[in-house]
Amino acid sequence: MKIILGISAFYHDSAASIIIDGKIIAAAQEERFTRKKHDSSYPFNAIEFALDYANIKLNDVDQIIFFEKPFLKFERLLETYVAFAPKGFKSFCMAMPIWLKDKLFQKKMLFNELKKHDNNFKDEQKIFFSDHHLSHAASAFFPSPFEEAIVLTADGVGEWATTTVAIGKKNNLEIKKEIHFPHSLGLLYSAFTYYTGFKVNSGEYKLMGLAPYGKPIYEDKIVKNLIDIKKDGSFWLNQDYFNYATGLTMTNDKFDNLFGQKARDSKKEKLTQFHMDIAASIQKVTEEIMIKIAKSLKEEFNIPNLCLAGGVALNCVANGKILKEKIFDNIWVQPAAGDAGGSLGAALALWHIDQ
């Protein structure tokens, strides 16, 4: 019997999962216990619940896996700040102390936190790290009913990747293609979330819900100025309009000038038809990109099944458009498509790919 504990934490949507011999036994999100929406803290309560539900002690666990690789994320941060210098100096000064104090030493930090669950837990070598998008892909493919599938993941950013394509076949999952930061469909959508006055990494569903009340009259402005979309759905974002790579905001003055208004202050300004039209426009662009990617993948790999995960896969309207296009015979979406599902995916990847 092999027991694996998967953990996601320290960005948003912390969670824990336990699988035993490849079977999902327990999975829980920390916010359900703390009542803090998108709780990013170490998932102590979720781990306690999972251990209790599985009727095991932490020391019984054979392997513990974190859903992403902190050193690669730190590499991205450093390379990004160097590439955009001198822009981003304030953001750099704010980020570095956190990384140098805690995040770079995540294995030791995890070990110290894990010991609080079980005084007998003393083996730091049980702790492993998965790739962020591999965790997403595994969370979508391995629980799916398919023996073989194309697996598309899209979110803000993992270590470097923002969009990946993998092929899953039985116990194997191989990433074939990647789009890298700063070019990100998830961050593009989050930029408009910010611009319309909603909270990033939280209010994207509100932007999606706002879209039906508007008309996509700004679609042309988006595709002509902000994003270059290729025939296969791959894309390139014009960083002249964004601050997210190095700044403390998602968009900048050039973005404001393009659409004729500053970002909405939700404490002072009500939503207007302008914001509804903006929402409709970015929603349509997102749907068209996802459909183009889906069509090109079906044509290239000719596999009838599609699995989806990553934060963008929480856009159920876009998922519905892919389904309506009848590109694939079958589509399976990981319900916990965001980072919470990464805890499950990391554990499943370690079990299946390690076999």
Predicted regions and their residues:
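Short acidic/glycine-rich loops and adjacent helix/strand connectors
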Residues: M1-Q355
